[in-house]
């Protein structure tokens, strides 16, 4: 189970790129290329921020570690990476258990970014710090009921189907008011913002989602921690940052292709 004293998510990208003086221990020798890839992505995020006159501490890098071994996660944790995203619940639970006893991994912040089935909500509520794929009230209700009292409220993002396609996951923009109205009353959930996975052809998806995010912020001043806009991956990270993303999700560019 996660550490109740863990600090909430914050940026993990060094403001000073010269700060990269890689410190590795013996177990990291086989992961030098991983460290270099992570450093390169950090630099790309910083450069994207600089291009639009944003501070690097406005954007958090979420390292998507699905299908990758716990050893790789530990290596990046030793470098300072704190936020990790997992799609597959059973695999994630195994990593959380393996890494839980390692001092350098105690401050890891785990994000669940996969689809949520009703029979999996308890494990998610008990083991993750963030859920980025909330799209239905019934799931929110279960997460709220199953979040242990000794843990801080579970941070949640609403996944928005910004393309309004029937085949895609996410809450339709038109249904957001009703879902927000329900979630904001759950004491064991902390509603933090929105997440999208837009179609490549949807060229204005980022701008539209940013506008949604700002509209909700104005309409719901009671959401005091409404501060997170998770959008952008390896191929469109810079565009997302230019449109106000506060969290980018990067997997393959850091960890390499699936084995």
Residue ranges and their predicted role:
Residues 2-6, 12-235, 241-243, 255:
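Conserved alpha/beta-domain cores
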């Amino acid at each position: 189970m996660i550490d109740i004293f863990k600090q909430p998510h914050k940026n993990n990208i060094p403001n000073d790129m010269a700060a990269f003086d890689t410190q590795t221990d013996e177990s990291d020798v086989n992961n030098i290329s991983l460290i270099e890839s992570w450093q390169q992505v950090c630099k790309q995020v910083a450069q994207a921020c600089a291009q639009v006159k944003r501070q690097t501490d406005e954007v958090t890098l979420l390292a998507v570690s699905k299908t990758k071994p716990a050893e790789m996660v530990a290596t990046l944790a030793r470098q300072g990476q704190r936020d990790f995203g997992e799609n597959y619940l059973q695999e994630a639970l195994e990593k959380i258990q393996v890494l839980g006893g390692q001092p350098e991994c105690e401050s890891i912040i785990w994000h669940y970014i996969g689809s949520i089935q009703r029979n999996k909500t308890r494990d998610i509520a008990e083991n993750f710090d963030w859920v980025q794929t909330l799209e239905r009230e019934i799931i929110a209700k279960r997460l709220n009921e199953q979040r242990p009292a000794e843990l801080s409220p579970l941070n949640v993002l609403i996944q928005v189907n910004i393309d309004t396609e029937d085949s895609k996951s996410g809450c339709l923009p038109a249904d957001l008011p009703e879902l927000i109205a329900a979630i904001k009353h759950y004491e064991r959930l902390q509603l933090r913002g929105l997440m999208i996975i837009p179609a490549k052809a949807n060229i204005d998806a980022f701008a539209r989602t940013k506008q949604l995010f700002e509209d909700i912020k104005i309409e719901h001043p009671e959401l005091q921690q409404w501060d997170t806009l998770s959008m952008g991956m390896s191929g469109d990270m810079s565009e997302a940052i230019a449109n106000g993303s506060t969290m980018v999700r990067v997997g393959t560019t850091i960890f390499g292709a699936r084995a």
